[in-house]
Amino acid sequence: MNATEKKRLDKLVRTYRNDLYVKTYKDMAIQSQLDSVVDQVEIQDYFEQNKANFRTNKDLLRGRYVRVSNENNNLRTIRRSLRRFNNTDKVFLDSIALQFTTYSMNDSIWVQSYQFFNRLPLISEKRYKNFLKNNTFFELQDSLEVYLVVIEEVVLRNELAPMEYVKPTLKQILINKRKLELMRQFDREIIEEGFRQKSYELY
């Protein structure tokens, strides 16, 4: 390596090192200033203004189910409680949950339909779309067990996604927007400081 090449390589190394220092400092400075708390109002506003961008590419639903022995002495009460599902019913179902083979009572959470029906082996992937209806109760039975299922609400593919379902995405978008604005602000301050010190180099 001749002297010219060595000089050029040294300059590249210095530039790379300086860029790395600047990037590390920049990342640390931005992270220290970044507010990652996003309130519900901000999420709601962004969602309302950008609804067209949040259409689901999967069928979604909110629902609950119980899988229980068809010889269970409480079967009639379980059926009634699962359908009605008031506070008393919830307490009752929770108190006998050990009698269930499997169950899910968290019907406030939106899930992809195929994930929900995968827990119900009596319903094939081809058949489950027949059950995608709002406020639906149905019952399936094999030789040993009964499947009691309530579908509260359905959102079909290409329809507007529920805000709660896309809430984590909305929150991350808003945090990224804040981060981008901090990066732009940081770059502006670096440029202004460079001009003030007459040490800014244009490439």
Question: Which ranges hold each PLM region?
Answer:
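Peptidyl-prolyl cis-trans isomerase
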Residues: 1-203
